[in-house]
Structure formats: C-alpha cells, structure tokens
Amino acid sequence: MTEPTPSRLERLALRMTALAERWLPDALPFALLGTLLVAGLALGLQGMAPAKALKSWGDGVWSLAPFSLQMAMVVIGGTVVATAPPVARWVDRLAGLPRTPRQATVLCAVASMTSSWFNWGFGLLFAAVLARALARRVAGLDYRTLAATTLLGLGTVWAQGLSGSAALQMATPGMLAPAIRTIAAGKGPGGAELVPGGIISLEHTIFLWQSLAAVAVEIVVVAALVAAITPLGPRARTAADLGIDLSEPSDDTHDRPHDGPRVPGQWLEHQGWLGRLIGALGLAAVLQQLWQAEHVAAAITLNTVNLTLLALGFWLHKTPARLARAFARATPATWGLLLQFPLYGGIAALITDSKLSERVADWLTAAATPLTYPPLVAAYSALLGVFVPSGGSKWVIEAPYVLAAAHRHRVHLGWMVAVYDLGEAVANLVQPFWMLPVLGLLGLRARDVMGVTWTVALVVAPLVLLLVTALGATLGYPL
C-alpha cells in the first residue's frame, strides 16, 4: 500500500512530536524541578527563612492525601465501569452503527467527548474500547486517527464536566488548604466574605450556561475537524497495516457455574446478589445526597462521583470476585498520581506560605484587564499544563494567585475556574502523559497519534481563547 503523503500541518505536528519525545522528560522530573524552582523563588525572591520553607514544604507534602485517594478512585472507578461486560456488549452494538471510516472516527470523537464530560476516567477507557471495536468492523479505517480521537475528550471538555478536578475541589469542603479558601472567599464591605467559606458550588462553574455553551461549541467544532482530517483510501493505515492484533483475549471475568468453588468462603465470592445489593445501597446513598441537597449541583462532589462509580462497578460486575479482578487491572494506572501528588502538595504550600501567590497575582493584575484576564489565564493554564500534566494538582498551585487576581479584576470567580479548566484541557492534546493508559490498550506509541492531537490543538486553542473572552463578558462579580 502506498504511504500516504502527509499535509504540511501533519508534517509539522510529527516533527514537534519527535522533538518532544526526544528532549522533554517525563512528568515526574517536572514535579521535582518545580519543587526546586519554587523553593528557590520562596527563598530568593520572597526572602523566606530556610527553616520555615522546609517546614512548609514538609507539612504540605501530605496536604493532598485525601485528594490523591479520590483522584485515584476516579481512574479506577472509570476503568472498572468501562470494562464491565454489559458496557462492553453495548459498545460492540454501538460500533456497528457507522458504515464509513469518516463516520467511525466522528462517532469515536463524539463518544470520547460526551462520555468524558460525565467522567474523564470512564470516557478515556470507554473510547478506547469503542475504538478497538470500530477498527474490527469498519474496513479501510485509519487506526492512527481513530486512536487519537479517543483522547479528544481529555483534550477538550472533560474538565468542564462532572469529574473536573478544579470545579470539584472548589465545591468540596476539605479538598483545599484553608489558606486557598480564604483567598477564594475574599473580603467585602465590613470584612464580610464575598464567597462564604470560599466554597464555589458546581452551579457557578460547570453548570453555568456559559460553560455548557462552551462544551457544545467544542464538540461541534472538533467533530467537524475530525471529519475533515480523516485519511481515506490509500492514505489510510489500518491496524493490520501497522501490525496490530485486534483479537480480543479470552474473557476470564465470567464465573463458570459448572466448575465453581466448593468451600463456603469461595462460594460467597461468586454470588451475584451480594454485589448487586451493595451496588444498590451505594446508588441509593447517592440519590439521597442529591435529594437532600439545596441544589443538585452542590451535591455533586468527588465523593459522590466516586461513590456512583463504585456502586456501578458492584452492580455491573455482579460478583465480588469479578469486581476484585477489575480493580486489580485498573489499579496500576494510578501510580503516577500517588507518586506526584505529594510533591505538588509541597509546591502549593511553599507558594501560599511564602506569599509567592500574591506576587504572581500582582503580575497577572498588572498584565491584564477584566476583559483580557480570562484568556490570559486560559493560555497560562494550557502552557503550565504541558509541564504539570495534572488538572487537580496544578489547580492547587494556581488557585491562590488566579483567584486573588480575579478578586482584584472583579471578574466572576466560578467562571475563572471554568477558564482554568478549558485552558488546562488543551495541554492534554500536546503532551503524552494521559495518553499512556490508552496507547497501551490500543498497541500504539505517542508519536503515532500526536500528529492528529496537535492538529486539533491548533484549532481548539484559539477557539478556547475566543470563548472565554466572549462568554466571560456576560458574567458579573463575584458569582
């Protein structure tokens, strides 16, 4: 088959991908270097005493321990639900809908974005499972482009959805340091808090009509872009062309009654009623929280999201044995979070305790106006996200000065959380950190898909700057 001739934009993306893979280190060295850089700024620029800086860093290392566990559960829970047999069967039926390669890539892109809005962990794995099913069914489908579409939810709308880290942190008590809550609260006439407790519920972030409009625009634009760049005919390289085996491994998640366990303890592990009962209790607890909340949006926190995923995992996998195996398969994907989040906690503590956040807020205030502040933060968030590829931990670093400057510019604080999220997601299109779990499942390398994701980023980045500017102008202060 003739090798397809790439366009100028594709050639540029491939060159940039090769440079990034050759010269940029993994995410962990960035966290280590970031620790040293912030410590140096705290000591040199802010004049913080070395003993105080050391104590601040040491205390901050474990400040994100609850959040680290919650984010790990997002990854595990999303994976467990996406790989459950009933979901897998539904995915196979969905893969039977498209008839052409272009229809298949657009379907996968839309599925990735919409499912990632509900949960980024589920969306990432769900889209990957769908991509493999599509590649088996649709002839002449370019596997590289198809694989890249599985990442588009994480590169566009995920942070504007129900698992958006920054929005959930702002809405969940105890998920941010008290110093950050104080900054978010602000001070009004007479010293009263402008935002009580510094808590910003989801109705003021992801459920703003402006946020929902931004999500809808991104989905439409990206779907149209994917349709336009999908290689057809001789330009396409299928999974077979790339030497990738799409056959499914034997499914060992189903219990076989005829050779089931005999001892009582093992018998209990394979009883479907037990898992279904616990799953039902979990879903009932979530519904109770939603019913009792003053606003439904205010009740959707990391805890409720994770409880929902856990309950669905029990219900869909039925028996405790099946669920345990699903969790065991999903757990390795969380090691990066558990390793890096303590470092980010230490960085955040140094930034706030040294008043470095106030210095950066001064810079952002001086460099922007109320109209230009949102696009400035979106661009800065995207740039920093290339080097710190974690929306939640990066928000801990950015929140102090982003929110402080928002008060000074008198812009909507909830919208600035959404602005941060929209910018942060773009970074996932240009660096491979969050691509790794999916690429392993699809049998590809980062360089195989980043030409497509870079192409999407070139369109999405200016679109985001336009959206945050135009939609932000319709909102008042403080919420």
Question: Where does each model-flagged region fall?
Answer:
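Membrane-core helix-loop-helix motifs of multi-pass transport proteins
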Residues: 130-237, 435-467
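Hydrophobic alpha-helical transmembrane segments of multi-pass integral membrane proteins
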Residues: 97-130, 338-354, 365-404
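Cytoplasmic juxtamembrane regions at transmembrane-helix boundaries
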Residues: 85-107, 231-253, 413
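Flexible loop linkers connecting adjacent transmembrane helices
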Residues: 12-16, 52-57, 82-98, 129-143, ...
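C-terminal transmembrane helix pair
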Residues: 133, 137-154, 368-479
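Helix-loop-helix module between adjacent transmembrane segments
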Residues: 74-82, 107-123, 144-161, 214, ...
